[in-house]
A protein has these predicted regions:
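A Zn2+-metalloprotease active-site environment signal
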Residues: 2-235
Length: 235
């Protein structure tokens, strides 16, 4: 038996290493392919379910208390940017109280963009919010949230196959979306979309940097969430 332990150990290491390679490189490619062939209706349904889960089941969000007039001015400003650049994807803008999430804006599958009251309050003007949303539009355009969610599910299924716990894969998706970190390539794509959009509409790019610096200051104070790291976005 002792003579075979080395081979067994080597086989286990090879299996683990192969699995790691598949998760790191194979799963993202599979997620990209699945996203391309998925009907938009299916992605939209996933986004609706994720938002509903975040609203109720997980209690991340509360109804927005931002004044209706302020919401409208942000929506109009973002609409003007999209009209000017003519490259915006279809999107749906949602306002929520951030609760434990705090000051943030992010994309969900199905072209949904969520803006929290806290980041609206943190901004000094609508231009800063539009700059942040231009970045999120980059994620929407490239379907990054959906691709990341598929990647998470595929990785979860692999883990479930090992542990035998399948139920956690579906039930944990909304929470997983809140902890999701885009790859550096995805962030770069979103940053470039935002930069081009701001330049085409003659909006100052520093508006994006200014609000991110305030978000970063909050993070150092422990009052901002640790997901969607502002410092990473600023880079």
């Amino acid at each position: 038996l002792d003579n075979h332990l080395g081979w067994v150990f080597t086989g286990v290491l090879a299996t683990v290493f192969t699995g790691w390679l598949f998760v790191q490189f194979g799963v993202p490619k599979m997620a990209e392919y699945v996203a391309k062939i998925t009907p938009p209706e299916m992605e939209a349904k996933l986004g609706e379910q994720a938002l509903a889960g975040l609203d109720s089941q997980y209690g991340y969000f509360s109804p927005s208390k931002t004044e209706a007039a302020h919401k409208a001015s942000i929506a109009v400003a973002l609409g003007k940017l999209c009209v000017a650049i003519k490259e915006c994807p279809h999107y749906r803008l949602e306002f929520r109280g951030g609760g434990v999430i705090g000051a943030n804006a992010f994309a969900l599958p199905g072209d949904i963009m969520v803006v929290t009251d806290e980041i609206v309050a943190l901004s000094k003007n609508d231009t800063e919010i539009v700059a942040v949303l231009a970045h999120e539009l980059g994620h929407v355009k490239q379907r990054h949230a959906y691709r990341q969610s598929i990647q998470g599910v595929l990785s979860g299924l692999i883990l479930a196959a090992v542990t035998g716990d399948v139920s956690s894969v579906a039930s944990g998706l909304p929470a997983a979306l809140m902890q999701m970190r885009y790859s550096r390539a995805h962030e770069t794509e979103a940053d470039m979309f935002a930069l081009v959009a701001l330049q085409k509409t003659c909006l100052p790019p520093h508006a994006f940097a200014d609000i991110l610096q305030r978000l970063e200051a909050q993070a150092y104070d422990g009052t901002a969430p640790n997901n969607h790291n502002p410092k990473d976005k600023a880079k």
